[in-house]
Swiss-Prot record:
GO MF assignments: IMP cyclohydrolase activity; phosphoribosylaminoimidazolecarboxamide formyltransferase activity
Record bears the keyword Hydrolase: yes
MGS-like domain boundaries: 6-151
EC number: 2.1.2.3, 3.5.4.10
Taxonomic lineage: Bacteria, Pseudomonadati, Pseudomonadota, Gammaproteobacteria, Pseudomonadales
GO cellular component: cytosol
Listed GO biological process terms: 'de novo' IMP biosynthetic process
Keyword entries, A-Z: Hydrolase, Multifunctional enzyme, Purine biosynthesis, Transferase
Family annotation (Pfam families): AICARFT_IMPCHas, MGS
Domain of life: Bacteria
Domain notes: The IMP cyclohydrolase activity resides in the N-terminal region.
Reaction(s) catalysed (UniProt annotation): (6R)-10-formyltetrahydrofolate + 5-amino-1-(5-phospho-beta-D-ribosyl)imidazole-4-carboxamide = 5-formamido-1-(5-phospho-D-ribosyl)imidazole-4-carboxamide + (6S)-5,6,7,8-tetrahydrofolate; IMP + H2O = 5-formamido-1-(5-phospho-D-ribosyl)imidazole-4-carboxamide
Protein name: Bifunctional purine biosynthesis protein PurH
Organism: Ectopseudomonas mendocina (strain ymp) (Pseudomonas mendocina)
Pathway: Purine metabolism; IMP biosynthesis via de novo pathway; 5-formamido-1-(5-phospho-D-ribosyl)imidazole-4-carboxamide from 5-amino-1-(5-phospho-D-ribosyl)imidazole-4-carboxamide (10-formyl THF route): step 1/1; Purine metabolism; IMP biosynthesis via de novo pathway; IMP from 5-formamido-1-(5-phospho-D-ribosyl)imidazole-4-carboxamide: step 1/1
Length: 535
């Protein structure tokens, strides 16, 4: 078994980086420790200009850089020095004048940043495919028994500390090698994804339609947490997050207190947070089993999130028990106190948690309190995935939103201004309810939610039952449906319940029949032209 604690010193290092963050300080520390530094191109110039002694690779190999820098380090004196097994290949290395290279610090051409530029063409992308860098990275990672490979700028300080203590252990070199292979895997994946979307006939990158999906799909996720179990206790589980952090989300959130997040906690918290992010004014969303069971929006001058929580909770006090609560404003002490005194809650998440709120929630040690940071009003584009047996469904994120001016009034009666506000509110909520989804809302508060039924009319019936059970007034409320009504019965039931306005996508072959039902009941109805199935 390999000794994991014995430290190996570094006598010679090769440094060639595109991201020069911290490289001067790192090189100075290496030089101060007596390490001979080999370097290339822009990195060599940076070191030389700043007084750090280094040998240019071209001088070391006796072979110049050529082909506009395409060939720099692809030489036996470099790769022999990296790949040479110290216990086996010493004689061969001596015979050919190859000196051992004990540490390689390399990061790669910025391919991702290059192809993200609007004016990037295929030729630009090709020139930013690194060849020498990944070759050195893989060589050093393969020979991690004798060589340390450094691809992350964040590792520099720790490496210097270890070298000052006598060298790097095998365990450290193994970990660095793993990071290196993760790095090159992600890099090659980006290249394959990009080239897989190229339309050769147009010699350009396709950005719409089928051409937006690469021939193979490569994406990298990093394990953030191993969980006690999965959706059910007999299932094992872990939580992986995207390598590149995006907008504020459950994946970027910091847990301030509470028990470890479970598989279901993460899924439900994501549903709650993404729903509350849909609203600009202060809002509260309560989720149970990935469905919103209570949502409310209240302007600051009318009570803000404190009042919004009361209204969201009132929608369905039974389902709120053991739920997830999300806010789109800083959680204050008063609101936190109302929550912990009123109900059992699994998770509370907000962009910011006040000191007063932290103090209040600390009395309930098991409550998971998450701070996710602020987000912009614009939802970021990206991909959603759904695993099926033997495959993966990939689609663009459902970030479609509608405004009042997008609504198509299809009935004789137009909705009032208040009804329009409530219709848009209910529509935003329905987007996050499992299909078939029906949402009853009034004064920007949900009064009944019907979720996950195979029949749309049954979802409408459940929404009415929920409202009655909660003691909430349906008369004068509006109704949102995530998809069109295939028959008029959904409207007939809504009319009996007291619904006065309806928002739905439209598009049924029986739209005329459905519109007629609304007109007969004096209901105002608008079409969005956008469906929000959620499975």
């Amino acid at each position: 078994m390999t000794d994991q604690t014995t430290r190996l010193p570094v006598r010679r290092a090769l440094i060639s980086v595109s991201d020069k963050t911290g490289i001067l300080e790192f090189a100075r520390e290496l030089s101060a420790l007596g390490v001979e530094i080999l370097s290339t191109g822009g990195t060599y110039k940076l070191l030389k200009d700043n007084g750090v002694a280094a040998v240019e690779v071209a001088d070391y190999t006796g072979f110049p850089e050529m082909m506009d820098g395409r060939v720099k380090t692809l030489h036996p004196k470099i790769h022999g020095g990296i790949l040479g097994r110290r216990a086996l290949d010493g004689a061969v290395m001596d015979e050919h004048g190859i000196k051992p290279i004990d540490l390689v610090a390399v990061n790669l051409y910025p391919f991702e940043a290059t192809v993200a530029k609007p004016d990037c063409d295929l030729a630009d992308a090709i020139e930013n495919i690194d060849i020498g860098g990944p070759t050195m990275v893989r060589s050093a990672a393969k020979n991690h028994k004798d060589v340390a490979i450094v691809v992350n700028t964040g590792d520099y300080a720790g490496i210097v500390e270890s070298l000052k203590a006598g060298g790097l252990t095998y365990a450290q070199r193994f970990d660095l090698a793993l990071k290196a292979f993760e790095h090159t895997a992600a890099y090659d994946g980006m290249i394959a994804n990009y080239l897989g979307t190229i339309d050769l006939a147009a010699d350009t990158l396709s950005t719409e339609g089928r051409g937006a999906f690469p021939r193979t799909f490569n994406s990298q996720f990093i394990k953030a947490q191993e969980m006690r179990y999965g959706e059910n206790p007999h299932q094992s589980a872990a939580f992986y997050v995207e390598a590149k952090k995006g907008e504020a989300s459950v994946s970027t959130a910091i847990q301030l207190q509470g028990k470890e997040l479970s598989f279901n906690n993460v899924a439900d918290t994501d549903a709650a947070l993404e729903c509350v992010k849909s609203f600009v004014k202060p809002a509260c969303v309560i989720v149970k089993h990935a469905n919103p069971c209570g949502v409310a929006v209240v302007p600051e001058d009318e009570g803000g999130i404190r009042k919004a929580y009361d209204l969201a909770y009132a929608t369905d006090t039974e389902s709120a028990f053991g739920g997830i609560i999300a806010f789109n404003r800083e959680l204050d002490g008063e609101t936190a106190k109302a929550i912990v005194e009123r109900q059992f809650v699994e998770v509370i998440i907000a962009p910011k948690i006040s000191a007063a709120a932290r103090e209040v929630v600390a009395a309930k040690a098991n409550v998971r309190l998450l701070e996710c940071g602020e987000w912009s009003a614009e939802r970021a584009a990206g991909w959603d995935f759904k695993r099926v047996n033997g495959g993966l469904l990939v689609q663009s994120r459902d970030i479609g939103m509608i405004k009042a001016e997008d609504l198509k009034i299809v009935t004789q009666r137009a909705p009032s201004e208040q009804e329009i506000h409530d219709l848009i509110f209910a529509w935003k909520v329905a987007k996050f309810v499992k299909s078939n989804a029906i949402v009853y809302a009034k004064n920007r508060q949900t009064v009944g939610v019907g979720a996950g039924q195979m029949s749309r009319v049954n979802s409408a019936r459940i929404a009415a039952i929920k409202a009655e059970h909660a003691g909430l007034q349906v008369q004068g409320a509006v109704m949102a449906s995530d998809a069109f009504f295939p028959f008029r019965d959904g409207i007939d039931n809504a009319a009996k319940a007291g619904i006065t306005a309806v928002i739905q996508p439209g598009g049924s072959m029986r739209d005329a029949e459905v519109i007629a039902a609304a007109d007969e009941a004096g209901i105002a109805m608008v079409f969005t032209g956008m469906r929000h199935f959620r499975h």
